[in-house]
């Protein structure tokens, strides 16, 4: 009996030590919590609600403080469903921001925004935990070395080459192939890549997350027999989850990648699909918090939120982070604030075209809209640069002639222009290639094409060495 009493008194004293607040208002994922005077939690502190409601329903909700309202109240946003929460229930201030396990034990596993595993093999046993809100590296720590990151995708390697340790955006509307291209890059790069990869599913379809997981198991990037030999960590905050999860899952993925870069001094690949869902989640949260949106409807803090995520994704003298991000373009409008704000942070932009997808040319990459800061002769070399410029000039001339062809017909063009059109049509089709991840759809075995092979192919088309061949060849 004495032992039981002492144990109970210990439990009560532990509860007294905790900083507990009580819900005063619950509006969907937004929660108002009142604390004792002088006990207000800091911005970004996580609050935890555990226990049972009067109906006997188990409650386990983590939320993040977003605003200090005054009168000892804070406003927090939940990272999971708030079903079963009631006014008057207690929420414990953890005294720290959301923190997640990092390190080798996360490889081969699927985690949620809190770093909790959502797959079968049991808990993630890690001795190291990092907060998800971290500062970007100092200027003196940044690495400015320039080198090309070969992908095996012809059109990207030639016309908009990716920078090793840079940020790359795959921009396009709905259904033009962004996620397939992400999976191709994971397949082409992650298997040959010496370091590790982290993939963040930000507000995307659960089916796509499952497809990616299965694809990685098949290609042995995730090793089910020996999970410690896996090369990728997956972090998902899917479409059915509250905006608080989608808004922070990018930060969780970045935190896991930073451990491998800064502590293990490795080269890391960070895949984010889709960056627009991060913006949309921020917009939802902003509206729920009562902030006044500007004319287009996005949050007034769009630039700050995007900058705080993107500036962390960089290369330091310890290791590099190469980030490949899918950027959904609403209504195919590249001037929309979300893709426009994202593109300001990118080293290369691969733009996917609905017109090319309609023609059945995959990957449907628009060679004239796609850009890269690496397309300089002193970086890629004179031969690569001259070939790329020749391709762009031929395609640009073809684009200018299309109105004339539509009105007057091909026969009204000069001999030189007819030749340009014939070569441009070959160039338009030449970047098309079968992918390993698309074998199930078209039955064609995938092809990895090296950069020298790509340059050689275009160099044969430009001067007319292949004029005798039909377009389909």
Swiss-Prot record:
InterPro entries: AAA+_ATPase, ATP-synt_VA_C, ATP_synth_F1_bsu, ATPase_a/bsu_AS, ATPase_alpha/beta_chains, ATPase_F1/V1/A1_a/bsu_N, ATPase_F1/V1/A1_a/bsu_N_sf, ATPase_F1/V1/A1_a/bsu_nucl-bd
Residues annotated as binding ATP: 172-179
CDD domains per UniProt: ATP-synt_F1_beta_C (cd18110), ATP-synt_F1_beta_N (cd18115), F1-ATPase_beta_CD (cd01133)
EC number: 7.1.2.2
Protein's membrane topology: Peripheral membrane protein
GO CC annotations on file: chloroplast thylakoid membrane; mitochondrion; proton-transporting ATP synthase complex
Keyword Ribonucleoprotein: no
Matching PROSITE patterns: ATPASE_ALPHA_BETA
Family matches, as SUPFAM superfamilies: C-terminal domain of alpha and beta subunits of F1 ATP synthase (SSF47917), N-terminal domain of alpha and beta subunits of F1 ATP synthase (SSF50615), P-loop containing nucleoside triphosphate hydrolases (SSF52540)
One protein family per Pfam: ATP-synt_ab_N
Disulfide bonds: none
Key word Kinase present: no
Gene3D superfamilies reported in the protein's UniProt record: 2.40.10.170, Bovine Mitochondrial F1-atpase, Atp Synthase Beta Chain, Chain D, domain 3 (1.10.1140.10), P-loop containing nucleotide triphosphate hydrolases (3.40.50.300)
Descriptive protein name: ATP synthase subunit beta, chloroplastic
Organism, as annotated: Microlepia szechuanica
Gene: atpB
